[in-house]
Amino acid sequence: MNCFTTLAALLALVLGVGCGKQASSDGESPLGFARDIKGIMSRYCFECHGVEHKEAELDLRTVESILAGGESGAAIVPGKPDESILFEMIHDEQMPPEGKMPGADDIERVRQWIASGAKP
C-alpha cells in the first residue's frame, strides 16, 4: 500500500469508530433493555410495576410497556432522559418509595439507555 492508501484507510477507521452508537460502559455494544436495564428494573421496580401489581397502571417489564406507559403517559421519551418521567422519578429518589434506592451507577445506566434511544 502506498502512503495515501494507508492514510485513507486509517481515516476511514477512525471516522467509523467515532460515528458508532453509544456503547455500554463496558465499551462492547449499545445499551439494551434485556441485557443492561431489565435487571435494574427487576431489583427496584417490578414489585410494584410488574406481573402481580401495576401501580398507576404502569408495567416496567418490557420496552413496549414502558413506552405505552401508565396513568401519567409514556414512562420514557427515547433519546431524552430529562423528559422521561421514569428517569426523573429514580434520579430524584421519588421511586422506589420504600426499600433500597438504585445506586448512582444504576441510575446513570438508565439515563444512558434512554439517551441512546431505549433499545430492546
Regions found by a protein language model. Name each.
Residues 5-6, 62:
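Residue-identity detector for threonine
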Residues 6-16:
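Bacterial N-terminal signal peptides
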Residues 17-120:
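Aromatic- and Gly/Pro-enriched helix-to-coil junctions and flexible linker segments
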